[in-house]
């Protein structure tokens, strides 16, 4: 059992924290409301190719969940959730390796609101993204912006040659802007 270091919260946009891991990294979305939020991880490979790992409910493809045994070495846990403390909702992505990834983009999507065209913010969801590494790093970025939009680009992970930086992005976007600004996001918009 890994004993985590004290949690570090990145509160300001572009604030960053270094971390390492050697085979097990958990990225969790936790939130208090009953809103159906989706955790997604999009990425740019070192060769410039874009991809993503997200719920298979978007395109009805099991492969969208990813894999820990082969590239991308990232797996969205789907409905297999770890129990949470405090009765919070949880979605989780596990990462075995980021060796081939240059940058990972961690986003939340309020899919139902996007489909219905509702104006929404993330301020009342009580959300945050937590990152826990097997090197005992424990980082969090709050997802509580009052800006309107269906996509919340919470943070990014930058690969710095085996050391990593978690960067607070705190950027709320509409679907079209996310499509244009987040590499790999277009995957959930297409079959």
Would you name each region that the model predicts?
Residues 1-191:
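Intrinsic-disorder/low-complexity signal
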């Amino acid at each position: 059992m890994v004993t985590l270091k004290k949690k570090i919260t990145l509160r300001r946009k572009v604030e960053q924290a270094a971390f390492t891991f050697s085979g097990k990294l958990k990225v969790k979305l936790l939130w208090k409301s009953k809103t159906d939020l989706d955790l997604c991880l999009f990425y740019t490979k070192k060769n410039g190719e874009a991809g993503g790992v997200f719920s298979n409910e978007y395109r009805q493809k099991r492969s969208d969940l990813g894999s820990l045994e082969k590239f991308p070495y990232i797996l969205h846990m789907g409905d297999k959730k770890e129990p949470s403390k405090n009765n919070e909702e949880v979605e989780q992505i596990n990462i075995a390796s980021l060796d081939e990834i240059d940058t990972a983009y961690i986003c939340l999507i309020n899919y139902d609101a996007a489909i219905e065209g509702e104006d929404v913010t993330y301020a009342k969801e009580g959300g945050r993204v937590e990152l826990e590494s097997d090197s005992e790093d424990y980082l969090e970025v709050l997802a509580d912006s009052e800006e309107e939009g269906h996509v919340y680009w919470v943070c990014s992970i930058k690969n710095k040659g085996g050391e990593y930086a978690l960067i607070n992005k705190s950027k709320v976007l509409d679907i079209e802007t996310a499509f244009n600004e987040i590499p790999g996001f277009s995957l959930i918009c297409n079959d």
